[in-house]
């Protein structure tokens, strides 16, 4: 009854003696009679001091309640209540007070603005950030398809100072470069992608070896040295020459530059002195990423004669660790000849040695790699950025956060929350996969990478960020993209959490004005990291349909609620039309 008092305004008005309409009292009586001891509670409130002077005291409510119970009248739907628009109700009064395990309850209704108002707010926030001379990290959060790309492309046409646009992938980089040309932006270039130059696999794989051990700074030098020892008649000679020339020319380019998030973090410092920086989408998971090495491979490296004693001592110390640890700083500079000898390890040795946060068990060591974020003004446009996370990992940087008001989707989302739809739920559950394949047969599917072939798709969590190929199409997003618990733990440590033994357990939580069950943590920082990562991956997947401007449908099968969805806690064979 306490829950009902908190979430049902009709019941609240009844307890406070504020109901004037007898019909509302009867509606409430039918609802309360559906609960254990509901009749007793109703009469207790009816005969309370606050209802003593009400006109409906003359009615024989005891007789009415007995008739409701005897006739087995159903609990009425909240949709038929006069208070319907004043609360975040569930199916009926009882489920509102005590929702089922798989039910998503909306605690506060979103107030939407029209699309033009939301778009104009984005324009204003962006122009304010670009006009500022302060060295701040400007985080502008706006819905997918609100017009973020066109906003900065229009700015670039007349900007006095050139800009660097950083996007998540090479594919999106090419799309933005193409769109910029269509906008009439001429003084512009894109950083090169070695995969498009046709250089032989022998060379590119050898170069990749250096990236794999964390010696990316040496990779281009290796390529230049390879060119010096290569005959001009070699088919790779002209291709490598052109690639190196393009790398050098783009780094010195005085016009606009389109690049990837990863490449941005390794551009020469001089670029940030002459260019403004715009981040298209959140760069957090490029700055911070996790990698693992098996304990067996680690122990093997400690016996390598090509590594200095200081490095082997550090690795031996890591082998003895168990659980989460914050490591002391360790400076590592290996000689060129050593790099060539250890490049076949296939382990990010530099990343491991420099890692401040690690987790070790008997099988493997997982570590957090952190790239340096350039010390200059940056303007980020993202649908999923988390202000609190940036404030925690960059406490000494000035951060300006703006969230644009939301517009209502033109398209529709139907979300099935009858199961968590976790990776574990799909393991060897061919019946479930078969059912979902049938339900998703007329849509394009985004799901886990390891089961995408089951749905005849090449779209999976982690590779759809920013793409436009699915615009206006009916989609099915299948799965709850939970990451390994160790990943959450390492991110949380970087955000200031002090971890001992922490475990997930099923619990009802509140997130973005919704109440729902999730297998999550009691620790607030861990929960913040997990919910942000889940939300951002699901919203990125849903956002590919561009529902804000496109009248299409997205069907979501996941136990974590996405925005503006109709939540359905029972899976039916026929999808909602």
What are these regions (language model features)?
Residues 1-104, 166-167, 471-477, 524-528, ...:
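Modules that initiate DNA replication and primer synthesis
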Residues 102-577:
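ASCE RecA-like P-loop NTPase motor cores
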């Amino acid at each position: 009854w306490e829950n009902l008092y908190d979430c049902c305004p009709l019941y609240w008005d009844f307890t406070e003696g504020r109901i004037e309409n007898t019909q509302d009292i009867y509606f409430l009586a039918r609802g309360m009679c559906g609960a254990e001891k509901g009749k007793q509670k109703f009469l207790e409130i009816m005969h309370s001091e606050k209802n003593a002077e009400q006109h409906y005291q003359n009615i024989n409510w005891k007789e009415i309640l007995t008739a409701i119970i005897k006739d087995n009248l159903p609990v009425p739907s909240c949709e038929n209540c006069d208070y319907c628009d004043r609360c975040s109700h569930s199916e009926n009064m009882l489920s509102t007070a005590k929702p089922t395990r798989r039910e998503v309850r909306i605690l506060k209704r979103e107030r939407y603005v029209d699309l033009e108002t939301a778009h104009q707010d984005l324009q204003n926030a962006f122009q304010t950030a670009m006009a500022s001379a302060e060295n701040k990290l400007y985080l502008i959060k706006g819905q997918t398809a609100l017009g973020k790309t066109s906003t900065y492309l229009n700015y670039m046409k007349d900007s006095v100072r050139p800009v660097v646009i950083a996007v998540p992938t090479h594919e999106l980089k090419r799309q933005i470069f193409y769109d910029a040309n269509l906008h009439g932006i001429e003084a512009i270039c894109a950083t090169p992608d070695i995969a498009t130059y046709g250089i032989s696999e022998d060379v590119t794989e050898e170069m990749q070896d250096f990236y794999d051990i964390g010696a990316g700074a040496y990779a281009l030098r290796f390529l230049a040295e390879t060119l010096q020892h290569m005959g001009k008649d070699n088919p790779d000679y002209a291709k490598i020459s052109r690639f190196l020339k393009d790398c050098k020319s783009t780094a010195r380019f005085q016009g606009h530059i389109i690049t990837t998030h990863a490449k941005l973090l390794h551009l020469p410092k001089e670029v940030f002195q002459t260019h403004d920086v715009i981040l298209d989408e959140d760069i957090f998971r490029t700055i911070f990423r996790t990698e693992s090495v098996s304990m067996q491979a680690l122990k093997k490296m400690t016996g390598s004669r090509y590594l200095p004693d200081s490095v082997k001592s550090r690795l031996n110390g890591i082998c003895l660790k168990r659980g989460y640890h914050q490591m002391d700083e360790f400076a590592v500079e290996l000689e060129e000849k050593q790099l060539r000898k250890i490049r076949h390890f296939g382990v990010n040795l530099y990343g491991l040695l420099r890692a401040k946060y690690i987790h070790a068990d008997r099988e493997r060591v997982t570590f957090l790699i952190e790239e340096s974020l350039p010390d200059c003004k940056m303007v980020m446009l993202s649908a999923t950025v988390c202000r609190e996370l940036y404030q925690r990992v960059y406490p000494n940087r000035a951060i300006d956060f703006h969230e644009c008001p939301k517009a209502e989707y033109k398209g529709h989302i139907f979300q099935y929350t009858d199961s968590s739809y976790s990776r574990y739920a799909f393991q060897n559950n061919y019946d479930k996969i078969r059912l979902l394949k049938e339900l998703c047969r007329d849509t394009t599917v985004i799901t886990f990478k390891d089961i995408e072939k089951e749905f005849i798709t090449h779209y999976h969590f982690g590779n759809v960020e920013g793409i436009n190929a699915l615009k206006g199409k009916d989609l099915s997003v299948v799965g709850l993209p939970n990451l390994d618990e160790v990943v959450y733990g390492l991110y949380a440590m970087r955000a200031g959490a002090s971890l001992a033994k922490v475990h997930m357990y099923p619990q009802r939580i509140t997130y973005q004005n919704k109440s729902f069950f999730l297998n999550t943590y009691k620790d607030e920082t861990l929960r913040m990291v997990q919910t942000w990562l889940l939300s951002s991956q699901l919203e990125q997947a849903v956002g590919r349909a561009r529902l804000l401007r496109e009248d299409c449908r997205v069907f979501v099968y996941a136990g974590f609620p996405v925005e503006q969805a109709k939540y359905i806690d029972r899976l039916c064979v026929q999808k909602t039309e």
